[in-house]
């Protein structure tokens, strides 16, 4: 049951009494029922979501609720592509940055060849190779690991007591669309 005797966001949206066994209460707060749970209900249906959550082990329900909510909100914003649109945008950004690095590397090569005096940069091809490898490994390392060495998913899938709708990734979704 939601805190302070109030119903959870799902029960508020569905206009029913929230009891102790409510499968939605740990994941949908009362305050954002109209935005987050409304999208989940419209895209997937409350009955389907509750069945899926009940079939999962307790420790996986928070991750599933976050994923379902993210996908539902994405599908509401972009009915055709859903969350894949965000993935496409990030992929295009990586491709654009790789092209920019290649262009800047060729500019640096041209600069070093035009300045054939003794103090030129001798390691330009090595630098370009390092930069190319850095961008190709971007998704594997930089996106998945933050400065603390933790996986970025660890910051997203927090402890089960945190309300889903208060997570910063879901609050900042407008930034990406």
Curated annotation (Swiss-Prot):
Coiled-coil segments: none
Tell me the InterPro entries matching this sequence: LOB (IPR004883)
Domain (LOB) spans: 6-108
Induction (record text) = By auxin.
Q: Per its UniProt record, what Pfam families does this chain match?
A: LOB
Source organism, top-level taxon:
Eukaryota
Q: In which tissues is it expressed?
A: Expressed in roots.
Which family does the UniProt entry place this protein in? Answer: Belongs to the LOB domain-containing protein family.
Name used for this protein in its record: LOB domain-containing protein 33
Q: Which organism is it from?
A: Arabidopsis thaliana (Mouse-ear cress)
